[in-house]
Amino acid sequence: MKTLNVELIVTPKTPKKIRKGVKLLLSALKITDAKPVYLSFTHRSDTYLNSFCFKNCEDEKKKTGCEIIYGWSLWEDKKLGFYEAEFHSVIKDNGDLIDITPRRKNEDSILFVADMSKTSGRKSVNSWYSWSNCKIVNGHVAEVSVELEIVQADGELSEFHTAHAIAGKK
């Protein structure tokens, strides 16, 4: 028997509706008490970089005293039956959730759900504790989220391109 390896190009976008795939993500993440909300980007500083949500929120908290909220950006490629939850942080200012991290893909908004059971935090000068992405393909969990360390390799490039994950515990 021969094995056929197929590589699909997935182009996830912000879900327009909360469909079954998004609900499956929430279930896989064990989120039962929070509802996803759409958040637009709010510019707070020219120094905030795309994909550096942890650092951006940390810097904003130092400047304004706001609260950092951890959770998940939810993505879908509906045509391929692909759904993904990406660990993300936003701020809470005057009771409102605000996404201050510029977008990689210029999305108008993201679908965000808070997850009070997961946290992040600085481990060293250039690394944070975080969680890997959770992925669902055709209604089945393809990757579960695990705790990891994000290492900032270069301040000019996004975490997406410069980070590496090291499975481990705090």
Describe the residue ranges of each PLM region.
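A structural boundary/capping signal
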Residues: 1-170
